[in-house]
């Protein structure tokens, strides 16, 4: 999180760095340093930092109360030390063609407990990354201001940036609303700006699944998958699912907005990520280490499991980002994100390919990848106008299980469309499945008895 940015670790080990503070400031620094150290050493860090979360209130009213952050020289030094250390680690471990690292951070605007967080990814190297300091929600809580800063830095440095919305399921309906965080209706300018900077969204992670909810997909038997009925705030508040929280609803809202303003602001590729805060890639169910590093210590697990609110053990073992890149390099992976040739899994390393086109036929399955690229577009692409025979588009789809995990149940296509009145709809189609099951009269498929 750019708002604290590893500064807590720097303070824990090296103290708050300030030049010549007066007596009162010195006492405050000493108190804060020791309070932080005591909380971490006693294992009560999560409880200590919970009081920093916002209180529950109307997000659009809360965001109006934002004021520019005051000058805090000691904290600024600690944060810059952390950024220097992080960029060095990323650069030292980047091995093009073998293992790719990125310079990035999280922008964590949470007005009134509404999660508007974005993950910022760049293709910067260490030298370029240290020429700027990450933009945080303390600089501005509005996504548009973040995008403006990214555009400015891109022009100054030549660095490519991506802004990836995440945990939209706890955004209190604002992440994919038809109005902006400032309360203005989405217009053409905003739609184009958002499309430019946010081609991809994170739809599954440790704090639940953001694809859809049974309130908005009542005919989908999988819409109850991995809910997270909590908000990121001080105090409790009953969870209320809102249309603007979920990605599948956002895709439909984008189609509706395109009819109104001429641009679809929510034409999104989808990825998963862990957000585990442990530094461990443990997204698989049998290899789950919890949300925080404290959860990874065996003797702490029973206490965490009994907590009333969200904890590392009320969360999901999820997820992974899969990217169809030409090579394992920063440039190639960023290119794949830009064209949305990405997908999400909840942890298993399932391999999925999808191509769409107007002239694809069943015979193209013989060389799915070559024919898919030659005669169609890959996942995340736009089909364009009908260039083939009468009828709709065709799709080539291939899914292969992770050899270390369960068998696959089925492949589905979820269709979203806008009718003549401008209203959107969705329909779920089962197109391939394991075993000798058959579709019923409503196109439904019985649950698989065993996926192992």
Model-based region annotation:
Residues 6-9, 72-75, 87-90, 105-115, ...:
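C-terminal functional module detector
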Residues 121-123:
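Long, charge-dense tracts
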Residues 125-126, 208:
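Short connector loops/turns at beta-strand edges and beta->alpha or beta->beta junctions
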Residues 128-130, 218:
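Substrate-binding clefts and substrate-entry loops adjacent to catalytic sites
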Residues 1-103, 111-113, 128, 135-138, ...:
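An N-terminally biased module of ancient metal coordination in phosphate/nucleic-acid-related enzymes
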Residues 117-119:
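Histidine-centered divalent-metal-coordination microenvironment in nucleic-acid enzymes
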Residues 84, 144-148, 249-252:
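Short, contiguous clusters of charged residues that form electrostatic/catalytic patches at enzyme active sites
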Residues 142-153, 170:
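Short loop/hinge segments at the start of secondary-structure elements
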């Amino acid at each position: 999180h750019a708002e604290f940015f590893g500064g807590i670790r720097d303070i824990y080990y090296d103290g708050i760095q300030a030049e010549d503070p007066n007596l009162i400031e010195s006492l405050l620094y000493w108190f804060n340093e020791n309070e932080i150290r005591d909380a971490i050493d006693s294992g009560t860090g999560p409880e200590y930092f919970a009081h920093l979360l916002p209180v529950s209130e109307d997000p659009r009213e809360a965001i109006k109360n934002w004021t520019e952050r005051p000058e805090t020289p000691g904290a600024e030094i600690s944060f810059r030390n952390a950024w220097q250390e992080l960029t060095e680690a990323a650069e030292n471990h980047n091995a093009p063609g073998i293992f790719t690292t990125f310079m990035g951070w999280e922008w964590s605007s949470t007005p009134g407990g509404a999660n508007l967080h974005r993950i910022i990814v760049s293709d910067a190297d260490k030298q370029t990354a240290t020429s700027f300091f990450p933009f945080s929600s303390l600089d501005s809580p509005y996504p548009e201001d973040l995008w403006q800063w990214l555009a400015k830095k891109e022009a100054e440095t030549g660095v490519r940036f991506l802004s990836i919305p995440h945990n939209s399921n706890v955004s209190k309906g604002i992440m994919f609303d038809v109005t902006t965080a400032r309360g203005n209706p989405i217009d053409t300018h905003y739609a184009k700006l958002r499309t430019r900077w946010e081609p991809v969204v994170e739809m599954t992670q440790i704090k639940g699944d953001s694809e859809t909810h049974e309130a908005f997909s009542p005919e989908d038997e999988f819409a109850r998958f991995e809910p997270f009925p909590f908000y990121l705030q001080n105090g409790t508040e009953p969870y209320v699912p809102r249309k603007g929280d979920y990605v599948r609803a956002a895709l439909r809202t984008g189609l509706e907005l395109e009819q109104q303003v001429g641009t679809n602001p929510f034409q999104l590729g989808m990825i998963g990520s862990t957000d585990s805060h442990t530094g461990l890639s443990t997204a698989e169910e049998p290899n789950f280490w919890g949300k925080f590093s404290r959860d990874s210590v065996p003797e702490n697990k029973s206490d965490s499991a009994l907590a009333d609110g969200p904890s590392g053990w009320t969360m999901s073992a999820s997820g992974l980002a899969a990217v169809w890149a030409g090579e394992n390099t920063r440039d190639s992976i960023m290119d794949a994100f830009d064209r949305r040739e990405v997908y999400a899994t909840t942890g298993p390393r399932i391999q999925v390919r999808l191509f769409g086109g107007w002239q694809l036929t069943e015979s193209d399955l013989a060389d799915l990848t070559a024919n898919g690229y030659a005669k169609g577009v890959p996942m995340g692409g736009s089909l364009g106008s009908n260039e083939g025979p009468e009828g709709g588009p065709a799709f080539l789809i291939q899914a292969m299980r992770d050899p270390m995990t369960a068998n696959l149940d089925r492949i589905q296509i979820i269709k979203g469309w806008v009718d003549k009145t401008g209203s959107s709809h969705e329909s779920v189609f089962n197109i391939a499945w394991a075993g000798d099951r058959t579709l019923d009269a409503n196109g439904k498929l019985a649950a698989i008895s065993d996926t192992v």
